[in-house]
């Protein structure tokens, strides 16, 4: 029995399911999860002293690679002055100014401690600003585990086959409307049916929680037009895509201006940070300047702010362009070696994120199509790659992530392993 196996046995006795977030449990692929001891650059190292090329990147934040020296130095320096004050600090201002400089639609920014807090707060703000109760989201889009948003969701909820969670009252869930991703007609139909009742549309501009599904041409622009025509707000959930699809997020990549944006993952440099922001007109409705209440003891934590600022500063350099080039090389390489081994594979990628689907279909563009892919084949592929030292997301419904630390050799080694794995399916 490996040390990871032993630790998982201990964990299950004291932690529900042995993990503190369901996707980590390997339920989506079978077997016991790896317990990680350390990480450096593009590699993670488990407690059994095995190394892996990592394409999970802590589920997105590690865009610079693990244990980045500038982030580590910033955290160590900040710790010298204390861990948390519960009072304003200058670093919060500097961090917010940096976010605004990269994402101009965020004229004002409120820091929180997680992506779930960011989306939950943005939804409350949209409801308070418009005076409407209903919100519209998309099947397979995941926006955190708050009650309003855990309806027909993606990510770990989809992996576990529970896209809508018990514990959410029907009277509450009825205010969450769901449409089909990449289908504007389904959106328009709901706005017609619930005229003047919908506060906002919230959408992952690239759906990274039902694997990696790209918006079809005109989809995001169509959502903007529908919101404008109905006096509803458009919220782009960029917790995953922010600073990863492009330095200015998916909104820069696809040239779309939202009313509100939510951020997480990359913004914290590995620390627990989230943020939401938008036009000053809307953000002025947040307490203490407005009536919509939102608060958090550790919001704007100075250690997290220093880590996040170091991460964004390091990203804001010419080398950032290499991220998309590395991702394209990996994605097209996977497509090529799969074809060489006669394995049907669909590939999607944008910026520094990618996804692949075992399917005969040329394109996967919504929740139904993602669920129709060969999940059993993915499970086999996952373990064949893991045995060769390649760590992929342990679920067919999660996107993969590259970092600037991944070398050309890392990618070549990954493709060599993938070719062998495809040949064994």
UniProtKB/Swiss-Prot annotation:
Q: What is an annotated GO biological process for this record, any one?
A: protoporphyrinogen IX biosynthetic process
Subcellular localization(s) per the UniProt record: Cytoplasm
Using the record's annotations, give every residue carrying the modification N6-(pyridoxal phosphate)lysine.
265
Keywords on this record? Answer: Cytoplasm, Isomerase, Porphyrin biosynthesis, Pyridoxal phosphate
Task: Tell me the leader sequence span.
Answer: none
For this UniProt entry, what's an example GO CC term? Answer: cytoplasm
Identify the SUPFAM superfamilies for this entry: PLP-dependent transferases (SSF53383)
Pathway assigned in UniProt = Porphyrin-containing compound metabolism; protoporphyrin-IX biosynthesis; 5-aminolevulinate from L-glutamyl-tRNA(Glu): step 2/2
Cited NCBIfam families: hemL, PRK00062.1
Quote the subunit structure annotation.
Answer: Homodimer.
Family designation: Belongs to the class-III pyridoxal-phosphate-dependent aminotransferase family. HemL subfamily.
Q: What is this protein called?
A: Glutamate-1-semialdehyde 2,1-aminomutase
Native species of this protein? Answer: Psychromonas ingrahamii (strain DSM 17664 / CCUG 51855 / 37)
Gene name of this polypeptide: hemL
